[in-house]
């Protein structure tokens, strides 16, 4: 029993308080000689024959709720396939059914999932996969990931494995699989990024899948009562999070329409542009002088070399320091230098970023139907805002780059529209606080930041004139508001 966490950390990370208390409660048991590593007896089974399936069939039919968890070869049903379905009807149980048995009894599984309360961890992933590949439907389901998000909104704490480590007796059960994966990848000279669960033998994958199902059932038993105790938490979970995750699943299934011809053209054009930028940089007299003085090839991505080039070779005046005290060569500084070299380097940076972050990701991620599918998360922020991850962050499309925007093209008969919910947080604050001053701006449909600026700076103009006549004051008001 080795202490690895100072209890004072709970002051800065309150979400760890329960873990610390739980650890202290274990100390008397440890001192009394109790075996803290002892696990409850498990009922795990890999169902790969008809006889094995029949042994569990009645148990599933008689259960009121069933944990469902799938193992796949890819994160996307458009590029991967289901290997099997793990299920559980009680804690410490996990039944992993091979995909061959599932396909043989597909109608039975369809009826089962239609009739039972199905419990998932990250339901969006499992239901999307099974709906797409097998046509299953889940009219009644719960999600332990969203239950935990209600109880603890901290980012990065909602994964099944860390939650199982904190709240169940299963420990770090992914370790054996990870060790096998690394060993297999080394032996077969395969990159870990190219490894998929279809490469795992059943004696590794099946126990792992069973533990996924077991962990989910145990977490449901802990989280669901806690959420139900709070009227606010329960309303958030039932009325907002569950419907929202269903809506996000629809977004992910649909994906975004991509103009693949434009993607290919832009990839070639940006490559030409980047080569021209490099040519302009490398042939500049100052860069050649740099290479003679420092006896090395100039690297435009090196902050130290940029500093030497602009402030030692060109003798330009530095304007800003970094947190470490070194002269900065960030975008603002290079822009203010107003030098042909700094302009070329800024263009190279921008083109390189666009090519890597957007063009390459879109080109490599687009599916056969010409649509790009990525993730939308309702548990990815502490504020309750959505986040996007995967092939492309759909919430981070460059606002002013028309080249990138042209990569998205509506299918015939449709339009792509751009909407923005302005000052959303302030709207909620006005509604929840009952502040009449805040509410008036929205009731009268005024520009909120202009409205605040007029009051703050006692401006004589009408609210609708502030944005044009006093842009700086409006920006100050905006900064203070947020």
Where are these regions (language model features)?
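Active-site-proximal helix-loop-helix substrate-binding element of RNase H-like nuclease domains
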Residues: 2, 31-48, 76, 80-228, ...
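Acidic, glycine-rich two-metal-ion catalytic cores of nucleic acid-processing enzymes
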Residues: 61-64, 68-93, 99-102, 234, ...
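Short amphipathic alpha-helical coiled-coil/interface segments
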Residues: 209, 213, 244-247, 263-281, ...
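Short alpha-helical scaffolding segments that buttress acidic/His motifs in well-ordered protein cores
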Residues: 82, 145, 164, 205, ...
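N-terminal accessory regions of nucleic-acid-interacting proteins
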Residues: 13-70, 78, 105, 109, ...
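Short, flexible loop segments at boundaries between secondary-structure elements
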Residues: 1-15
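Short His/Asp/Glu-rich catalytic/ion-coordination signatures at enzyme active sites or charged loops
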Residues: 190-200, 204, 242-273
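Secondary-structure capping and boundary motifs in well-ordered enzyme cores
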Residues: 77, 156, 197, 201, ...
């Amino acid at each position: 029993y080795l202490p690895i966490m100072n209890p004072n950390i709970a002051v800065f990370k309150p979400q760890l308080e329960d873990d610390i208390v739980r650890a202290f409660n274990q100390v008397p048991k440890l001192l009394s000689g109790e075996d803290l590593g002892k696990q409850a007896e498990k009922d795990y089974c890999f169902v790969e024959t008809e006889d094995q399936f029949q042994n569990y069939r009645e148990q599933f039919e008689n259960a009121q709720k069933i944990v469902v968890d799938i193992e796949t070869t890819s994160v996307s049903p458009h590029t991967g396939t289901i290997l099997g379905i793990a299920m559980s009807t009680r804690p410490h149980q996990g039944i992993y059914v091979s995909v061959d048995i599932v396909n043989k009894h597909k109608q039975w599984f369809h009826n089962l999932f239609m009739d039972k309360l199905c419990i998932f961890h990250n339901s969006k992933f499992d239901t999307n996969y099974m709906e797409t590949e097998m046509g299953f439907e889940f009219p009644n389901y719960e999600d332990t990931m969203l239950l935990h998000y209600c109880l603890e909104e901290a980012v990065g704490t909602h994964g099944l494995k860390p939650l199982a480590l904190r709240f169940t007796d299963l420990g770090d059960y992914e370790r054996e699989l990870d060790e096998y994966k690394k060993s297999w990848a080394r032996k077969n000279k395969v990159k870990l990024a190219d490894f998929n669960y279809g490469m795992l033998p059943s004696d590794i994958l099946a126990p792992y899948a069973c533990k996924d199902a077991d962990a989910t059932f145990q977490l449901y038993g802990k989280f669901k009562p806690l959420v139900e105790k709070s009227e606010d938490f329960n309303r958030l979970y039932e009325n907002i999070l569950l419907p929202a995750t269903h809506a996000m699943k629809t977004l992910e299934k649909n994906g975004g329409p991509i103009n693949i011809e434009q993607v290919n053209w832009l990839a070639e054009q940006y490559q030409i542009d980047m080569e021209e930028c490099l040519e302009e940089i490398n042939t500049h007299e100052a860069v050649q002088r740099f290479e003679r003085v420092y006896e090395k090839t100039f690297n435009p991505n090196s902050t130290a070399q940029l500093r030497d080039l602009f402030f030692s070779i060109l003798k330009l005046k530095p304007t800003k320091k970094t947190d470490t005290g070194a002269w900065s060569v960030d975008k603002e500084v290079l822009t203010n230098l107003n030098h042909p070299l700094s302009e070329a380097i800024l263009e190279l940076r921008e083109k390189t970023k666009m090519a890597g972050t957007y063009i390459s990701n879109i080109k490599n991620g687009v599916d056969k139907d010409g649509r790009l599918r990525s993730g939308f998360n309702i548990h990815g922020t502490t504020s309750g805002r959505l986040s996007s991850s995967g092939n492309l962050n759909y919430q981070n499309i460059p606002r002013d780059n028309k080249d990138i925007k042209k990569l998205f093209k509506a299918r015939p008969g449709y339009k792509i529209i751009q909407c923005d919910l302005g000052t959303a947080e302030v709207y909620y604050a006005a509604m929840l606080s009952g502040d009449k001053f805040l509410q008036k701006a929205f009731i009268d449909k005024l520009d909120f930041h202009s409205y605040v600026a007029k009051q703050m700076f006692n401006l004589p103009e009408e609210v609708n004139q502030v944005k044009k006549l006093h842009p700086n004051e409006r920006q100050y008001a905006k900064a203070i508001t947020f």
